[in-house]
Amino acid sequence: LPYTITMDPTAVLNIIYKTAVLIKKTVEDVKANQQQCKRLGERIDAINQCLKSLNDRDLKRSEIKQSLDNFRKCVQECLDFITQFKEKTSWFVRVFKNQNHKEQFQELNLQLSQCANDLNLGIN
């Protein structure tokens, strides 16, 4: 039976906000795929703006806790993915990997949309 530690929702929110700040800083330094990276950051910021309206009662609800944790994981994945574009790689490697990156950006955008929907459903 897997044992999971459920973090305090306020702590999860703080992690999300701090990771979003890191994403913003990282986006400033990316050498490739600047627009896509920036767009991911903007989508995360938009969701974070909505999260700021959550009150303590909202945060205690189990569906919100789960949705917040899923969003935290997704935001971390976005940061991990964006960070790789800080490195300067040869044009050949970038072109070769570009198709894979396109799919990864689509996947992350899809995950962000799903997180936003789940959070929205949990809030309303």
Per-region residue spans from a language model:
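N-terminal amphipathic alpha-helical segments
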Residues: 1-63, 91-98, 102, 107, ...
